[in-house]
Amino acid sequence: METLLSFSAIAVGIIVGLASLGTAIGFALLGGKFLEGAARQPEMAPMLQVKMFIIAGLLDAVPMIGIVIALLFTFANPFVGQLG
C-alpha cells in the first residue's frame, strides 16, 4: 500500500513537471516564431497576434489537463481500490 502511494506521488510529480516543461518549450517556440514573423512582415503582425493568442490558449490546456490527472491520482487514486 505504501509503495503504491509513493509511486503515485512520484507519478504526480512527473506529470506536473513534464506538462509544465512542455508548455514552457511550446510558449518559447511560439513567441520566437511570432517575433520572427512580425519582424519579417510587420503588416501581418495583427493577424499573427490573433493566431498566436489562440494557440497560446490551446497550449495552456496541456498543463491544466495534467493537473487534473495529478489531482485524480492524489485524492481519488483508482489503483488503491484494486489492492483488495
From Swiss-Prot:
Q: Where is this site: Reversibly protonated during proton transport?
A: D60
Keyword line: ATP synthesis, Cell inner membrane, Cell membrane, CF(0), Hydrogen ion transport, Ion transport, Lipid-binding, Membrane, Transmembrane, Transmembrane helix, Transport
Write down the membrane topology: Multi-pass membrane protein
**PROSITE patterns (alphabetical):** ATPASE_C
Q: Name one GO cellular component term.
A: proton-transporting ATP synthase complex
The subcellular location is: Cell inner membrane
Q: SUPFAM superfamilies recorded for this chain?
A: F1F0 ATP synthase subunit C
User: What Gene3D superfamilies does the record point to?
Assistant: F1F0 ATP synthase subunit C
What is this protein for, i.e. what is its function? F(1)F(0) ATP synthase produces ATP from ADP in the presence of a proton or sodium gradient. F-type ATPases consist of two structural domains, F(1) containing the extramembraneous catalytic core and F(0) containing the membrane proton channel, linked together by a central stalk and a peripheral stalk. During catalysis, ATP synthesis in the catalytic domain of F(1) is coupled via a rotary mechanism of the central stalk subunits to proton translocation. Key component of the F(0) channel; it plays a direct role in translocation across the membrane. A homomeric c-ring of between 10-14 subunits forms the central stalk rotor element with the F(1) delta and epsilon subunits.
Q: Which family does it belong to?
A: Belongs to the ATPase C chain family.
HAMAP family associated with the record: ATP_synth_c_bact
> What does the further note read?
Dicyclohexylcarbodiimide (DCDD) binding to the active aspartate residue inhibits ATPase in vitro.
Its quaternary structure?
Answer: F-type ATPases have 2 components, F(1) - the catalytic core - and F(0) - the membrane proton channel. F(1) has five subunits: alpha(3), beta(3), gamma(1), delta(1), epsilon(1). F(0) has three main subunits: a(1), b(2) and c(10-14). The alpha and beta chains form an alternating ring which encloses part of the gamma chain. F(1) is attached to F(0) by a central stalk formed by the gamma and epsilon chains, while a peripheral stalk is formed by the delta and b chains.
The identity of this protein, by name, is ATP synthase subunit c
